[in-house]
UniProtKB/Swiss-Prot annotation:
Biased composition (Basic residues): 379-388
CDD domains associated with the record: MIT_spastin
Main location: cytoplasm
Region of interest (Disordered), residue spans: 124-156, 344-398, 636-666
Protein name: Spartin
Short sequence motif named LC3-interacting region (LIR), residue ranges: 193-200
Keyword Transport in record: yes
Sites bearing Phosphoserine, chain numbering: 470
N-acetylmethionine modification, residue list: 1
Organism: Homo sapiens
Length: 666
């Protein structure tokens, strides 16, 4: 009888967690023994794992009272167990049918070119063409006859000699139904072979599975959704036809501590249903001069089998460079330096060094992942793109040029309603005029303050003896000024940091908001009867409003600085004129301290959590509107220049007045 845990966790959650741990323990053992070729032991482990998976899934966790983080974690474990159960059952069915064992045994034999079919009436219905009677003799491959053909064999394990009832020179025979172990998705006609399912069938079957199915710590480094083909090379040297263009991705595991426990590589390459483990400086990869990447076929566990990966020439250059860079980091990538056609065999030659034998190439495909050229130094890519050898034959064909790839549709410029552009330009123009008016008004106000202060000082009678201010008071005010100034700088630094974080978060959130927000917008707003988008027009107006508000806000800041500087300077001058230089200096420190306190209070108000959320939302909106902004910064630059000139002029005047006051006091 199962006991309740001390922390009050329900017994059902404990059962699910125990079933989860035991199930994956047996599944991992089954995977390890399966990779070692111990099929019977692997089946026993798989069956035990399925039992624990069924036990964990059988417990209901969807009742209304099952709430809280514990039940949420349990539901996630059950979902993962369901996905694992499907995969384990599929693998167990394959093992029980003996497909994997038969495939491995058949590969030990030399594959033939054409399938062996019952001789029915095919030879009588298809008379031998005259052109085949004079065909050249066939080349011998390991003692068996084979015909040189452009088409190749996708499943060499099921190949055998042609029927003796047909001449040896006859073309391959076709049957209305697929032979045992094969599937057909096409049918023959008088004009050629046609697919019976269409392009959608292949596209739907070439989509990458979810990343979560590979592991919780799986990290996808690159994903090419389409335009990648693979072909297979058997031990006899025969090459299969390229597969239908599919996806490619490279995945690495973040938790390296589990690699030895689960007996898994640090990462792997996946091209459709084919997987290749990637171990830095150990997994051999050869880039051919013909444009293909060659890998040992480790999934078949048979020596001499290779897989070629071909990238379409229509793929972006950045994807190709990233793919090569990742291979360089995660495998033992090498270049085919020369293609020797004179001897009619493909040799991977390194200029100035001896050539590796074919036995060395075959040994590289074993489980120990030996190096391709034993005894030689590595020939690796240097820089971003490796250069092709100078003596490469000009007759070589780049295989990537024949791989079809879906073209990327060009983005058409959005058609905006006429009213949106007019309103946007009017908003920007009005904001520019308002900002200019604020700066100009502040300049006039500053001059008026200066005139008023001068007239006030003319009516004031200075004290006969300057007021003596205690040095302690002066020093205290000076220290207060320095302290408040430092606080203002620190608070400003913190505000800048908060703004930087908010900007980064806002930029990351903007694409998601735009993606999911567009789903909530009715189609009537996305496009009207004239083909124009009212929503885009409204976004342009909103972006212009943000630009206009920013322009007006900058004008307000410039105007406020001008007025505060003028008021502060004239106040200090008036006190200095009336009570002497020492009193004026003390007043100057006090006014600066008051200004610093105000700035610090304003900055602290913008550091809190609410301010952070507000800034993040604001930056998200700004990022969304970046594509709709209309650049019009000429007037803004003029306003800032005028404000800066005005502030500099005021500071010069203040400096002159301070010097004059010091002379009078002396």
């Amino acid at each position: 009888m199962e006991q309740e845990p001390q922390n009050g966790e329900p017994a059902e959650i404990k059962i699910i967690r125990e079933a989860y741990k035991k199930a994956f323990l047996f599944v991992n053992k089954g995977l390890n023994t399966d990779e070692l070729g111990q099929k019977e032991e692997a089946k026993n482990y798989y069956k035990q794992g399925i039992g624990h998976l069924l036990r964990g899934i059988s417990i209901s966790s969807k009742e209304s009272e099952h709430t809280g983080p514990g039940w949420e974690s349990a539901r996630q474990m059950q979902q993962k167990m369901k996905e694992t159960l499907q995969n384990v059952r599929t693998r167990l069915e394959i093992l029980e049918k003996g497909l994997a064992t038969s495939l491995q045994n058949d590969l030990q034999e030399v594959p033939k070119l054409y399938p062996e079919f019952p001789p029915k009436d095919m030879c009588e219905k298809l008379p031998e063409p005259q052109s085949f009677s004079s065909a050249p003799q066939h080349a011998e491959v390991n003692g068996n006859t084979s015909t040189p053909s452009a088409g190749a064999v996708a499943a060499p394990a099921s190949l055998s000699l042609p029927s003796q009832s047909c001449p040896a020179e006859a073309p391959p025979a076709y049957t209305p139904q697929a032979a045992e172990g094969h599937y057909t998705v096409s049918y023959g006609t008088d004009s050629g072979e046609f697919s019976s399912v269409g392009e959608e069938f292949y596209r739907n079957h070439s989509q990458p599975p979810p990343l979560e199915t590979l592991g919780l710590d799986a990290d996808e480094l690159i994903l090419i959704p389409n335009g990648v083909q693979i072909f297979f090379v058997n031990p006899a040297g025969e090459v299969s036809a390229p597969s239908y263009p599919g996806y490619l991705r490279i995945v690495r595991f973040l938790d390296n501590s589990l690699d030895t426990v689960l007996n898994r590589p640090p990462g792997f390459l996946q091209v459709c249903d084919w997987l290749y483990p990637l171990v830095p400086d150990r997994s051999p990869v050869l880039k051919c001069t013909a444009g293909a990447y060659m890998f040992p076929d480790t999934m078949l566990q048979a020596a001499g089998c290779f897989v070629g990966v071909v990238l379409s020439s229509e793929l972006p250059e950045d994807d190709r460079e990233l793919f090569e860079d990742l291979l360089r980091q995660m495998s033992d990538l090498r270049l085919q330096a020369n293609w020797n056609r004179a001897e009619e065999e493909n040799e991977f030659q390194i200029p100035g060094r001896t050539r590796p034998s074919s036995d060395q190439l075959k040994e590289a495909s074993g489980t120990d992942v030996k190096q391709l050229d034993q005894g030689n130094k590595d020939v690796r890519h240097k820089g971003k793109r490796g250069k092709r050898a100078k003596d490469t034959s000009s007759e070589e064909v780049n295989l990537s040029h024949i791989v079809p790839c879906e073209p990327v549709p060009e983005e058409k410029p959005k058609e905006l309603p006429e009213w949106s552009e007019k309103v946007a330009h009017n908003i920007l123009s009005g904001a520019s005029w308002v900002s200019w008016g604020l700066v100009k008004g502040a300049e006039i106000t500053g001059k008026a303050i200066q005139k008023g202060a001068s007239k006030l000082r003319e009516r004031i009678q200075p004290e006969e003896k300057p007021v003596e201010v205690s040095p302690a008071v002066t020093k205290g005010l000076y220290i207060a000024k320095q302290a408040t100034g430092g606080a203002a700088k620190v608070s400003q630094f913190l505000v800048d940091g908060v703004c930087t974080v908010a900007n980064c978060v806002g930029k990351e959130l903007a694409p998601h908001v735009k993606k999911h927000g567009s789903k909530l917008v009715p189609e009537s707003l996305k496009k009207d009867k004239d083909g124009k988008s009212p929503l885009d027009g409204a976004m342009v107006v909103a972006a212009s409003s943000v630009q206009g508000f920013s322009t007006v806000w900058q004008g307000l800041e410039c105007a406020a600085k001008c007025i505060v500087n003028n008021v502060s300077a004239e106040t200090v001058q008036t006190v200095r004129y009336k009570y002497g230089y020492n009193a004026g200096e003390a007043t100057h420190h006090a006014v600066d301290s008051a200004v610093n306190v105000g700035v610090t209070a304003y900055n602290i108000n913008n550091i809190g959590i609410k301010a952070m959320v507000k800034k993040t939302a604001t930056q998200t909106g700004h990022t969304l509107l970046e594509d709709y902004q209309i650049v019009d910064n000429s007037q803004r630059e003029n306003q800032e220049g005028a404000a800066n000139v005005n502030v500099r002029g005021e500071k010069d005047e203040q400096t002159k007045e301070v010097k004059e006051a010091k002379k009078k006091d002396k």
